[in-house]
Amino acid sequence: MTTREVCLLIGRDGQVLWSDESDNPFLLPDSRERWEAIWQLREELAEVAHSHPEGPLGFSAEDESTMSALTSALGRPLRFSVVAPGGTVVRVDGRDVLLSEEPWWAEPLRRVSGMRREPIALA
């Protein structure tokens, strides 16, 4: 199966408000539709999640730039997360945290992204 990056906009109640996908496993290019959805859903929006189907289990430099722009545009912090084969990482108070229990939408996000969960061993 082909892998692809997928983005989810998650509401305050944990429901998926909107989704977008690319045809590339390493990149989800900016899109006008996504930015319009973010702006239209800004009152309900609590989290922006996306997949890294080929890794890494963490935020890329492009992710960092996007997170900064979103926080600035909305005037408030959001929760950001990355779902990869090895788990889910969220940004909490400026720190990256590997979740021990993933949200309900993590597994469907993996499936749509063309990846399987492959837990990593921690030292």
Predicted feature locations:
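Cys-dependent condensing catalytic cores that perform Claisen condensation/acyl-transfer
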Residues: 48
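Conserved beta-strand-loop surface patch within small alpha/beta domains used
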Residues: 1-45, 53-123
